[in-house]
């Protein structure tokens, strides 16, 4: 069963807020902007992560210099799962943030 439009937006909003909170509390040198449902995280080395919602597909998209990734929400696990690799969003973010910022952050709740 696919997500309703309202449920999808609630999930993306909650995920983006959780990401903002986590990055705020991390102590990393970065800038964040959330505009029109697009969350951009800019690291001090110039790399960035861009999270956007794709309403027609009910997907959360992540753009990084290593590529674009599309995540579907799995109601059973309560996690965003990459449609291609089946990697959890939190796992991917832990790896990407380590590669971009050299810091280990815990994204288990994402």
Curated annotation (Swiss-Prot):
Keywords attached to this entry: Iron, Metal-binding
A Gene Ontology molecular function term of the record: ferric iron binding
GO CC entries: cytosol
Listed name of the protein: Iron-sulfur cluster assembly protein CyaY
One matching Pfam family: Frataxin_Cyay
Purpose of the protein: Involved in iron-sulfur (Fe-S) cluster assembly. May act as a regulator of Fe-S biogenesis.
Family affiliation: Belongs to the frataxin family.
InterPro entries, A to Z: CyaY (IPR047584), Frataxin/CyaY (IPR002908), Frataxin/CyaY_sf (IPR036524), Frataxin_CS (IPR020895)
GO BP terms, alphabetized: iron-sulfur cluster assembly
Domain of life: Bacteria
